[in-house]
Amino acid sequence: MTQTIANVTLLVPDYGAGIAFYVGALGFDLLEDTRLSETKRWVRVAPKGAESALLLAQADSPAQVAAIGNQTGGRVGFFLHTDDFERDHAAMTAAGVKFREAPRYEPYGTVAVFEDPFGNLWDLIEPKA
């Protein structure tokens, strides 16, 4: 039996804002944007070549709105691996991505925490070879 994680849901306040950040600032591919109803779309974004994707879900209830940016209780919830930390850190900084710390070197690789415009925390990581 083969299984994979295909999508991970990420609540956003607005589909357009989510697409603007993940596609515009991070350079992810827009894999799908299908209208399901007047208020709901199926929006998937992912880094080039990724096997799994983020499913951007526009919050539509008070509980969902309250969870935007805090889906992991203030912890880093997402991990973006790269083969060239310096290249991607520079490109993301130039695109206006807000890093919360300077790059640091850990036993597992080079890492820096950044946040999306909604408050979700990410690690940009170049794993140690």
Model-inferred region functions:
Residues 1-9, 29-81, 87-117, 125-129:
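Vicinal oxygen chelate
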Residues 15, 22, 105-108:
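Sequence-level detector for tyrosine residue identity
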Residues 17-18, 87:
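Short Gly/charged-rich anion-binding patches and loops
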Residues 18-23, 92, 119:
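Conserved active-site tyrosine of GNAT-family acetyltransferases
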